[in-house]
Design a protein with these regions (language model features):
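Membrane-interface "helix-start" segments
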Residues: 17, 78-88, 166-167, 200, ...
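Helix-loop junctions and terminal segments of transmembrane helices
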Residues: 122, 126, 130-164, 168-171, ...
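Interhelical loop/hinge segments that connect adjacent transmembrane helices in multipass membrane
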Residues: 43-49, 59-100, 105, 139, ...
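Membrane-interface helix-loop junctions in multi-pass transport and translocation proteins
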Residues: 12-17, 23-58, 228-229, 238-272, ...
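Membrane-interface junctions at transmembrane-helix termini in multi-pass inner-membrane proteins
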Residues: 1-20, 205-237
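Alpha-helical transmembrane segments of multi-pass membrane transport and lipid-handling proteins
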Residues: 1, 160-213, 240-252
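Helix-terminus/linker motif at the lipid-water interface of multi-pass membrane proteins
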Residues: 35-39, 97-128, 146-147, 183-193
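Interfacial/gating helices of multi-pass transporter permease domains
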Residues: 43, 81-89, 107-127, 154-159, ...
Length: 303
């Protein structure tokens, strides 16, 4: 992990290198798997292939960025000073454990072991698609930071609104489509044995809309404007609400996965409302255009 430096390549917008490197390594990984993994018992060869490709991926990224960035000596006091924001980032990166991962922990306590399968299938279907679509805005974060660093607020606003419009154009119709076709998606992904995961998939798809709103407000507005401390606090407030709601379901012997997704929706809605209030209070951005775009695509998709 000490070689993991992909975020630096993203910061320098080396996306062509990331694309070609990833394609080559993934192809090599597939060839190696089909060559060395012959049976279900070939666990060691599979582990070696996966470990080797991961190390190669990290090493190539490290060597590439080393051409542009040099090592610098950091004193002990500077290291201690830098540890505080790094601790905040650590908490921010792991705050998701208080949402969907927490839901799974409670669901596993239920009497029906299929419940966790339904939740996992729904999560895999929806988030697999959502994570691909979110790439449309994730690549813009370094450029947004660049504009803010230059105090070019007009360019920042234009790029943010364009990215949000593209993201919502992709994610809103997709989420509503999965909501309608949840049963079919579950069957295609996991066979008719898990047909009951269909309703869970539909509810999870609705949750993705809230997730998409939070992604823009949290990452591209609050976080990029150096308010990661407040963003972390909002995530933990929402996580606390999710713990409370999940506990309420647990003590009432309710373990159906759709109810736990509903608690996550409520918790993430709390986070979104806190973020909207914070953005308006500190005048970080006029949110009218973003929510107008969101409403427009929602109406068109429902129509």
């Amino acid at each position: 992990q000490f070689l993991y430096i992909e975020w630096m390549n993203e910061a320098y917008e080396n996306y062509a290198f990331i694309l070609y490197k990833t394609l080559i390594i993934r192809i090599a990984m597939l060839v190696a798997i089909f060559t060395f993994v012959k049976t279900a018992d070939d666990i060691v060869p599979y582990a070696i292939v996966m470990s080797a490709t991961t190390i190669l991926n990290y090493l190539l990224s490290f060597l590439w960025i080393k051409r542009e960035v040099s090592f610098v000596k950091i004193g002990l006091m500077e290291l201690i000073k830098a540890s505080k924001p790094l601790l905040t980032m650590l908490l921010l990166a792991n705050a998701n454990m208080l949402y969907t991962l927490l839901d799974r922990m409670f669901i596993t306590k239920g009497p029906d072991e299929n419940y966790i399968s339904y939740y996992t299938i729904a999560s895999s279907i929806v988030m697999l698609i959502a994570s691909v679509l979110s790439g449309a805005i994730n690549v813009s974060i370094p450029r947004l930071g660049y504009y803010l660093g230059k105090k070019d607020y007009e360019s920042y606003k234009n790029l943010l609104n364009q990215g949000a419009a593209l993201f919502y154009f992709l994610i809103i119709p997709t989420s509503i489509g999965i909501m309608v076709l949840g049963n079919y998606a579950a069957v295609i992904y996991s066979s008719e044995k898990y047909l009951e995961a269909g309703i869970v998939t539909s509810v999870f798809a609705f949750r993705t809309i809230i997730w998409a709103i939070e992604l823009i407000l949290g990452k591209q507005i609050i976080f990029i404007n150096d308010h990661e401390n407040r963003l972390t606090a909002f995530y933990f407030i929402g996580g606390g609400a999710n713990i409370l709601l999940n506990s309420l379901l647990y003590f009432n012997n309710i373990f159906a996965p759709e109810y736990y997704i509903a608690t996550t929706i409520i918790a993430e809605t709390v986070v979104v409302l806190l973020e909207i209030y914070f953005i308006k209070k500190h005048h970080l951005l006029d949110l009218k255009e973003i929510f107008t775009t969101l409403t427009r695509y929602t109406i068109v998709s429902l129509g």
